[in-house]
């Protein structure tokens, strides 16, 4: 993410969150279970922690937490995933994407395997890159770098991101807590341009299936 504290105020700001198609389609980056490559998942190649390190060093509680929080798995599901990972790494270090896939893919029926694996990989990727922390920092900096009546548009690709953006635009904070000034007016820096998120239509999804989960939210900074 960018450090907006060093930038001049802007009139328009666009933000497309998440991993790019280029990164997903680059086997050596380790973002996708479609390829058998090293577990990496770092957006910043200079970062110290990668997916391989995470999976082989995080303890049981840490792993359960990331699958529960970032994959939206139920507690029992997070425990099962974690148990299989720990059993596998006790025998051999998890090094490649297929090492991970092979130890957990049988936990669910074949018909939902891809969705299941996508959520597992998403959980690990979010933790490796501290994506939600970066998004919160970005949102908190917006009122300082966007001019009055400036426009900001953000595209999210999963519910965790979208919840943070939705809350911030509606209330001015990522928790979604309404704060009022001395006169009882809601104190928030932005007004919604579109009350509901803009989502792709069937034609766009057919052309680009990865757009299926995308949501576009637009807000305008108050004077």
Set out the residue ranges of the language-model regions.
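Phosphate/pyrophosphate-binding catalytic cores of soluble transferases and nucleic-acid-acting enzymes
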Residues: 58, 62, 70-76, 91-93
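A mobile, often basic/glycine-rich helix-loop segment
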Residues: 13-15, 19-60, 172-176
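Alpha-helix C-capping/helix-to-loop hinge sites
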Residues: 66-70, 88, 92, 107, ...
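Short, well-structured alpha-helical segments
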Residues: 75-86, 121
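C-terminal catalytic and target-recognition region of SAM-dependent MTase-like enzymes
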Residues: 96-144, 151-223
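Single conserved hydrophobic/aromatic residue that forms the stacking wall/gate
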Residues: 1-8, 12
């Amino acid at each position: 993410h960018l450090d907006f504290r060093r930038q001049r105020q802007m009139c328009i700001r666009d933000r497309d969150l998440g991993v790019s198609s280029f990164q997903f389609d680059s086997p050596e980056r380790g973002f996708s279970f479609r390829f058998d490559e090293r577990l990496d998942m770092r957006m910043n190649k200079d970062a110290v922690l990668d997916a391989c390190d995470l999976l082989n060093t995080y303890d049981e509680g840490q792993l359960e937490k990331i699958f529960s929080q970032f994959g939206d798995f139920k507690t029992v599901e997070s425990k099962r995933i974690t148990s299989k990972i720990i059993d596998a790494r006790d025998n051999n270090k998890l090094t490649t994407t297929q090492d991970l896939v092979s130890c957990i893919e049988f936990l669910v029926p074949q018909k939902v395997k891809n969705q299941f694996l996508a959520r597992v990989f998403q959980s690990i990727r979010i933790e490796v890159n501290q994506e939600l922390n970066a998004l919160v920092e970005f949102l908190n900096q917006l009122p300082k770098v966007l001019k009055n009546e400036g426009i900001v548009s953000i595209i999210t690709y999963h519910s965790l991101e979208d919840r943070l953006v939705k809350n911030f635009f509606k209330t001015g904070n990522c928790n979604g807590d309404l704060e009022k000034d001395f006169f009882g007016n809601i104190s928030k820096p932005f007004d919604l341009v579109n009350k509901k998120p803009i989502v792709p239509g069937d034609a766009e999804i057919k052309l680009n299936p990865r757009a299926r989960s995308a949501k576009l939210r637009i807000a305008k900074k108050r004077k």
